[in-house]
């Protein structure tokens, strides 16, 4: 049975060009980049080129890119690295209630060590209230961390305005852009972002590779002790093959970003229009005005999303009831709870996220089966 994959916010399939470019560094180009001989120097050059490509995608200097193992490590490094480096200046951090668990749990860890965290509410669309954000700032605030785009409902936050508020008070601004990088254009210079997290497997690179952008001049404590790698900020022999893969994925994303963004939007709108016409009693979660181009999050009245997902899986359709990091949890999504969605709707939420390998034929197959399954479940 053919798999129809609609969970590209959870992970993406590695692009053929990306896979091809990384393979030599798992076989013939296996040198340690810290070594002086030729295959070591070759590995070091490959890392430098990948760093340049990642930097180019978000418009920063290559020296401002630090490679990590994933978006979660980048988030942990940003929050804890800034908190510990600035603990003499203050102990207060501001974030939102709809952040990824990597942010929320990092904040909980910091709370256990004496830091104070303010969790800002969002409105029914998942948008942050800027006035409320600014009102929470104190003379002890050292960091504001707000996600660029939400992983469940796709809401794109007013990142540029948040950065302006942070800087007007002399505060560092970090954004978790794991869902945004590669899906929409991002310019850290124009948006005045201080720190940004990204992850390879969300943009057609392998799992196990990520990056953290840190604006030049910002000091942060290292997350891992050991050797000299990543300018003494992230020890451990570099994962050359996956760093190369991330660089290639970023190069492809930069070249095709406008076309790719439009493709996702067209597929999303085509799918949503068909669902709205054929299935009654559905509710769109999040705003359609400021939303990731490939994201649909809808709730079906009187349905359980776990059963719905299992029924879809039986016909080869992969989707999600929320983020992949929380979809197995019995409790309602913290994001849907934060936007005030009633429990009878949050338990029937379905997330569909589109990618480069999706087609209109996939959408037709999805809608045909979704209509049938929802009808059968409601009659049961």
Task: Give, region by region, the residue ranges found by the protein language model.
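Pyridoxal 5′-phosphate
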Residues: 1-380
């Amino acid at each position: 049975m053919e798999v129809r994959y609609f969970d590209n916010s959870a992970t993406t399939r590695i692009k053929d060009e990306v896979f091809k470019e990384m393979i030599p560094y798992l076989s013939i180009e296996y040198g340690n980049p810290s070594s002086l001989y030729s295959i070591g120097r070759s590995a070091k050059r490959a890392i430098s080129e990948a760093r340049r490509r990642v930097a180019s995608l978000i418009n920063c200097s290559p020296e401002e890119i630090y490679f990590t193992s994933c978006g979660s490590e980048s988030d942990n490094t940003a929050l804890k690295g800034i908190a510990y480096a600035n603990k003499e200046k203050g102990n207060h951090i501001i974030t939102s209630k709809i952040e990824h668990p990597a942010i929320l749990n990092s904040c909980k860890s910091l709370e256990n060590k004496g830091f104070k965290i303010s969790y800002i509410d969002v409105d029914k669309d998942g948008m942050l209230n800027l006035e409320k954000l600014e009102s929470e700032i104190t003379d002890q605030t050292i960091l504001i961390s707000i996600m660029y785009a939400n992983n469940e409902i796709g809401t794109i936050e007013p990142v540029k305005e948040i950065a302006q508020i942070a800087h007007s008070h002399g505060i560092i601004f970090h954004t978790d852009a794991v869902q945004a990088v590669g899906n929409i254009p991002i310019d850290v210079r124009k948006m005045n972002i201080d720190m940004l997290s990204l992850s390879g497997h969300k943009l057609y690179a392998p799992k196990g590779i990520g990056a953290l952008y840190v604006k030049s001049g910002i000091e942060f404590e290292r997350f891992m002790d050991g050797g000299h790698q990543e300018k003494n900020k992230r020890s451990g022999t570099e994962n050359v093959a996956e760093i190369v893969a991330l660089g290639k994925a970023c190069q492809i994303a930069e070249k095709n970003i406008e076309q790719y963004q439009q493709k996702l939007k067209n597929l999303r709108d085509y799918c949503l229009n068909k669902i709205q016409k054929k299935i009654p009693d559905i509710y769109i979660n999040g705003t359609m005005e400021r939303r990731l181009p490939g994201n649909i999050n809808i709730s079906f009245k009187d349905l359980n999303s776990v059963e719905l997902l299992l029924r879809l899986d039986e016909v080869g359709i992969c989707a999600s009831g929320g983020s992949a990091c929380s979809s197995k949890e019995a409790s309602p999504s913290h994001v849907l709870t934060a936007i005030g969605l009633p429990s009878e709707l949050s338990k029937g939420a379905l997330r569909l996220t589109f990618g480069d390998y999706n087609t209109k034929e996939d959408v037709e197959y999805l809608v045909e089966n979704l209509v049938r399954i929802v009808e059968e479940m409601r009659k049961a």
